[in-house]
Amino acid sequence: MAKAAKAAGSSARFRQRKISVKQTLAVLKQSDIPDLEEEQQRELQQIETGVEKGEEEEHHLQAAINSSIAQSTGAKVEKIYIPTPDASQVWKEYDRFYSSSFHEPASYIRTSVTVEETSGCLYNMDDEDAEFLKTCKPPISEDDFEEVMHRFEVTISEKQPFVSIDVSNLLSFEEMAQHIEDGIRQVQEDPTSPEYILAQLQSSLGITVNGTKGKNEGKAFLATFKKIGAVIYPHWRARKVERKGQSIVPHLKFEDHEKDDSDPYVCFRRRELRQVRKTRRTDVLSIERLRRMQAEMETAKQLVEMVATREFTRKAALKAEWDVFEDRCAIKTLKRELGIKGEDEDLVAQKKRKVEPKKEEKAEKASTPVRGGKAAGSAASAQAAAAQAAAAGSGSPSVSSTHVPPNVSIPPSKIPNMDLITIAQVVRDKDEAIAKAVREKLRLRADADRDWHNLTNSGYIPYCEYLNAEVSSSGEPPVPQYSSINEMAYFEKHNASHRYTTKSDFNKDLASMVGNKPFADAQVYGAIVGDDGELRLSDATSTSSPVDRVIPRSSFMSMRKRVGRGGRMWMDRRGLQRNTVLKPSSLAKNSLDDTAESEADEVAMERLADRQKYDRETEPTRQMSSYDKDPSQLNGISSDTQSIRFGSMLLSKAYENYREVFQQRQQQLMMLQQQILQQQQQQQMRNRQQSHPPGDPGAGLGGGQGAGGGAGGSRNNSPAPGTNGPQSKMHNAAPMGYNKQGMTPSQHQQYQQMQQQQQQQQQQQQQRKMGVAPMNAASAAAAMAAQPRRSSGSPDGQRFNGLPNGGAMANGVLPNGMSQRMMPGGDMKQKSELAKVDA
């Protein structure tokens, strides 16, 4: 019944293991199996003993299980207990069998699982060693014997690790003893060694070891080794030879793949892995790999053979050339000795002739299909033709025989040998191509602009530190940094007022239009611009640009949100400053000297400024200097990144031709200035001749003329005697042309002086390194004396309002804006001199 329960329980709980040929199987008959009823079998399967399977057969346990089953069915059975030893009493004979002699150890128990050397001597005696110690004289203790044997084993493993190859070459005792003694002394002198630290602790703490207090173990063992080392060495050598050089200390035996694994002493056997099933597919893949490898090896072999054949052929060719050279030298010497004269062409090394391809190869090359159809073929032919043309133009030898168009499928054996090109050469060729393109672009630009004169109002003149060196000292560029993109890109509202200064602007029909719509390139000096785009002059000597806003240099708007007291949210804007354009002082210059009226204007302007303080979404409007008109500054681009913004201008703004173009422009402007002065003088001379007869004493320079006339005239705004406003306007509309007839000798003399001064200025302009020389005070005074003045409000002033700086040119002197624009060498000192002469 117990066996049946065991079989039933094992079959229910454990998986049947795989049948092996090495496992014995029990053969059971029907009579061996107990015939149990189905109900009893079902009950037995549900009983759990709670012990291991090997202990379920214990008869006390089986008796207890059967009695509990009988009690559950209602039968009366004696209660059975499993006997256990009685632990309630004390064993009286305990002291006789277990002695209580215990000696406290010298130190704590030390052990190391990973480092075995720290656990003490690793050598353990066996029966042979015990027999040797019995017969050994003088007697040796077991601990000393094991320590010496261990030292021998460690020393031989360090000095002769391959002693198993030849056991007869073991070290002698003298060599081993010398090495062991040196090692002991080195350990004793090393403060970091465990033996040294242990000895110091024992001596300092007073710990006794084997009855000796603080004794150094190293020194004790060294003395012991000198006594018994020579006695133990023959025994150790005999055992080493018996082991064939292997270690005397027994080691675990591991599995050896070369031998049979049926050895029962092998430990740590490998886990048996499931053998991989071989199928036809794996065999095919292996065969394919082998075939591919064989083909690659054969190809490599053929390549090596071909390279070797090529090198041998080259060697033979070099040897043949050398033989030919020696024969030529011998023939030359022989001809000199015999005095033979004749042609020596065969004795000179001629250039090798290029081997022409055969007709068959040419036909095959011509019939080779081209990828991509006709378009690819035409592109390939075009590239080939371009490459040939470039080679011919640069003087390099033609490569047409070895050049192959791209996208052409040819066999690998017929790929031409092309020279390798370095990266430096590619970069150099690219730079040369770019420089050549720049030069060609500049040449075409110069040819296209040869018959044109650039007289535009808003021509952009980039700032150059080399050509405008005086900017660093004065702080103001002599040429306004202005570009037409200010109106075109940012100020589309004022495109209608943008005009160009050409000869067509000087006729009578456009005079009214020019007077009503001022130009956009006039220099701004403290002008106020209204929201309607109209100009409000703050100074009688300056005009204003139609610019009514300034593009911010930084971001469009910078805002910050913060939490104030009481949880209120505040929004702060960056750059909330007072509007400097709406200052009352800017309008006080044009107003009368009435104190009450000026104070009222100031109060009104303050109220207006306070009302419009937060109405602007950008930075407060401020005065634009010549640097602010530069596009890079308008766009808010820093000086470090301007090269990115203006990188596209490199082809047309080359520095090597900029200086020449700049000087040509200044010369053209000077010529235009001279022509305008001549036209003004001629027109004024005609006006005086028509208004005063030849005998009239008012024809002199001191006669009364227009407002702001000559040196002897008054500077009022009323017409001079002998002239009137409409008449002078009609005179200004007369045809222009220079004519010496009708001029008085004094006027002609003054005109010649003015021409001489202009010639001197041109000479100074050529001598200057960086631009045109400015006009001095003498030339400005001569220009003032040579022509009368007219007020900016007169018709003549409106007539020449198209010139730079408004109609100040009609006054007979170079206006401030013109002197600064046309003469880069001018500065603020020159402006002050002109102002003094004008006064």
From Swiss-Prot:
Compartment(s) where it occurs, according to its Swiss-Prot or TrEMBL record: Nucleus
GO biological processes: DNA repair; regulation of transcription by RNA polymerase II
Physiological role: Component of the NuA4 histone acetyltransferase complex which is involved in transcriptional activation of selected genes principally by acetylation of nucleosomal histone H4 and H2A. The NuA4 complex is also involved in DNA repair. Involved in gene silencing by neighboring heterochromatin, blockage of the silencing spreading along the chromosome, and required for cell cycle progression through G2/M.
Any Gene Ontology CC annotation: nucleus
Top-level taxon in the UniProt lineage: Eukaryota
UniProt region (Disordered), positions on chain: 350-379, 393-415, 608-640, 679-839
Provenance organism: Yarrowia lipolytica (strain CLIB 122 / E 150) (Yeast)
Biased composition (Gly residues): 697-713
A UniProt-annotated Pfam family: EPL1
Swiss-Prot/TrEMBL keywords: Cell cycle, DNA damage, DNA repair, Nucleus, Transcription, Transcription regulation
Family according to the record: Belongs to the enhancer of polycomb family.
Biased composition (Basic and acidic residues): 608-620, 828-839
Taxonomic placement: Eukaryota, Fungi, Dikarya, Ascomycota, Saccharomycotina
Subunit relationships: Component of the NuA4 histone acetyltransferase complex.
Name recorded for this polypeptide: Enhancer of polycomb-like protein 1
Keyword Cell cycle among UniProt keywords: yes
Cited InterPro entries: Enhancer_polycomb, Enhancer_polycomb-like_N
Composition bias, Low complexity: 679-690, 747-786
Residue ranges with Polar residues bias: 621-640, 714-730
